[in-house]
Amino acid sequence: MARSIWKGPFVRESLIKKVNKLIESGKSSVIKTWSRESAIIPLFVRFVFAVHNGNKFIPVVITEEMVGRKLGEFAPTRTFYGHAADRKVKRK
């Protein structure tokens, strides 16, 4: 079930503070976060977030097309190694 519209998007306060601090200083550095559930807002465009996937931090460059989605959507948590090969010996 989706979040109701009247509540607005959820964004962790610490992320907004970190982005505002970078804007004021004029620097561009990677913002580390564990907040995969935070929505991407227009303020985040052109910043680089290091989103934790449960094992390591995945760098995500925010573009305008990503606005409205969640940070966790761009840091996959599972690694797909492919399906197991058929191990039956084929005789001729």
Swiss-Prot record:
Cellular component terms (Gene Ontology): cytoplasm; small ribosomal subunit
GO biological process: ribosomal small subunit assembly; translation
InterPro entries assigned: Ribosomal_uS19 (IPR002222), Ribosomal_uS19_bac-type (IPR005732), Ribosomal_uS19_CS (IPR020934), Ribosomal_uS19_SF (IPR023575)
GO molecular function, one term: rRNA binding
Alphabetic keyword roster: Ribonucleoprotein, Ribosomal protein, RNA-binding, rRNA-binding
PROSITE patterns the UniProt entry points to: RIBOSOMAL_S19
Pfam families: Ribosomal_S19
Entry keyword annotation includes Iron-sulfur: no
Classification via PANTHER family: RIBOSOMAL PROTEIN S19P FAMILY MEMBER, SMALL RIBOSOMAL SUBUNIT PROTEIN US19M
Function of the protein: Protein S19 forms a complex with S13 that binds strongly to the 16S ribosomal RNA.
Membership in a protein family: Belongs to the universal ribosomal protein uS19 family.
Protein name (database record): Small ribosomal subunit protein uS19
Source organism: Orientia tsutsugamushi (strain Boryong) (Rickettsia tsutsugamushi)
